[in-house]
A protein has these predicted regions:
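Short, flexible helix/strand-to-coil boundary loops that buttress conserved ligand/catalytic motifs
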Residues: 22, 75, 120
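Short acidic/glycine-enriched loop/turn segments that link adjacent beta-strands
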Residues: 35-38, 58, 93, 100-102
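Vicinal oxygen chelate
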Residues: 5-13, 55-81, 83-123
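Core segments of cupin and vicinal oxygen chelate
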Residues: 2-3, 9-48, 53-55
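Short beta-strand segments
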Residues: 47-49, 60, 116
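Generic alpha-helical hydrophobic packing signal
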Residues: 27-28, 38, 43-44, 78-81, ...
């Protein structure tokens, strides 16, 4: 049996703004919110991020394996939005990419302080 993550909750101060920003940066679409309490963003056929409001929360780290073309498109939007980025979770604003595992990687924070990671890994 293959185990696949179906959804996870992403805490946010403003769930709709956070979901909209994530969708714009990642080139995705907001799902219909009418039937749910959450602000959902479908990442792929298996995974949906459910943004939910919370007054207090710790920051989380969300890592996404993407194709080279997806990396280029998302990274362009990160830079166009003026979001600081870096090569590691401990250097989020060094303006560099990493080449770990033979691919490219980058880290950046969203408005709620969550660390988002993009990585390409040759298959």
């Amino acid at each position: 049996m293959t185990i696949v993550l179906n959804h996870t909750i992403v805490p946010a101060r403003d769930k709709r703004a956070a979901a909209r920003s994530f969708a714009e940066i990642f080139g995705l679409h907001l799902e219909d919110e009418a039937s749910t309490h959450f602000a959902p963003v479908r990442v792929n056929d298996a995974l949906t991020l459910l943004f939910d409001e919370d007054a207090e929360f710790e920051s989380h780290h969300y890592a996404f394996h993407v194709s080279e073309a997806e990396f280029d498109a998302i990274f362009r939007r990160v830079k166009a939005a003026g979001i600081p980025y870096g090569s590691a979770p401990w250097s989020l604003d060094d303006g560099k990419l990493n080449d770990w595992n033979g691919g490219r990687g980058v880290y950046f924070k969203n408005a709620d302080g969550h660390i988002l990671e993009l990585m390409t890994v040759p298959q």
